[in-house]
From Swiss-Prot:
A GO CC term attached to the entry: nucleoplasm
Domain of life according to the entry: Eukaryota
XRN2-binding (XTBD) domain: residues covered: 7-91
Domain commentary: XTBD domain is necessary for interaction with xrn-2.
Assembly, per entry: Interacts (via N-terminus) with xrn-2; the interaction is direct.
Region of interest called Disordered, as start-end residue ranges on this chain: 95-119
Lineage of source species: Eukaryota, Metazoa, Ecdysozoa, Nematoda, Chromadorea
Record function comment: Plays a role in maintenance of steady-state concentration and turnover of microRNAs (miRNA) by degradation of mature miRNA in complex with the exoribonuclease xrn-2. Stabilizes and enhances the accumulation and activity of the exoribonuclease xrn-2, and thus contributes to miRNA turnover.
Any Pfam family matching the protein: XTBD
GO biological process, one term: mRNA processing
Disruption phenotype: At 26 degrees Celsius 80% of progeny arrest at the L1 stage of larval development. Reduced xrn-2 levels.
Annotated protein name in UniProt: Partner of xrn-2 protein 1
Amino acid sequence: MGKLEDVEAEKKLWESDDAWELRKAFMLAHYDDYPKIQLQCLSQLFINVTLLGCEYSQTLMQKIRTMGAGIAANKDRTKTGSYVKASAAKKRQAVKTSDLEGASDESKKVKMEKSPSPVARESFDERLGKLKASLAMTPHHLTGEQMMKTATNSCLMKWHVNKINQKIEITIDRYVAFRHTFSQYCVDPRDCAINTLIESILSCDAAVHEESYEIRFDGVPVDECYAKSVTRRLAKIKSAVSNGAHTVKGLTTYLDAVNMSMIQNTQKLEGWSQQLDLVTADLLLSSRVLSSTECTKPAMATIANQMSEDVCQLILNDKINVINSMKSHSSLAFQ
């Protein structure tokens, strides 16, 4: 397949003729300069900036302006259009709105202010699909943070983790993709949040919810993203649970396979009694009050195995639904 045919295959059904002619010109001008996926992202950014007035970081905006300088569709174009080479484009001035055929500057401005969202949203949803594909190809021996950095860089997207006390919020470009308040006993809430975001991207269909400026996975609001991810991960270990040991060691192994480490928390109560909690990923799996005679190491080990057996049976019964519920040792609980 030749260069022109390869680029022509990139046209989307929803693209207007003007937008496509500009994007095609951009892709042809830089066809030999970038990998295909990166060029697709850059060409859409060029359209977002040129036609929709979208704003990004200063560095990215300058890069797009430089790459797009001098690129415009010929008003009297033939079917093949008129393009400039990348080497020439970099020496020319950026295309102005007045250079584009159709409505006047004023009418274009009004239209741009009133209805940029449908095309912009479709474009961003498409980029989320590319982010999913990029994450799937990222080596899994990397940490969650390294995986996100690698994937977002390849898709020319920015992501940021904002932590205030135990509340974690993650944004991708200008949209919130994750939000959760962890309990004070969660060992590494940042790592939990990033791993959850990766699992959600890889397991769900992501789409922008414009009214709330959220990226929702399978339509779930971002405040419920963590609970739904934990629910999915528990469902994923069902096969291993059905074929393995229903003990603390066995359950710990199954949970580790889906990035959920299990810990045992003990809390002293009145007298000699204690409360034993099994917690994973800030989810309270099981809780039991121990009498004074049960507070020895051998007895607690036996009871922990019994509690693990109960959790395994719960997983096998397909009745798991995890919800936000701030407990003494967790921020999630079974409904």
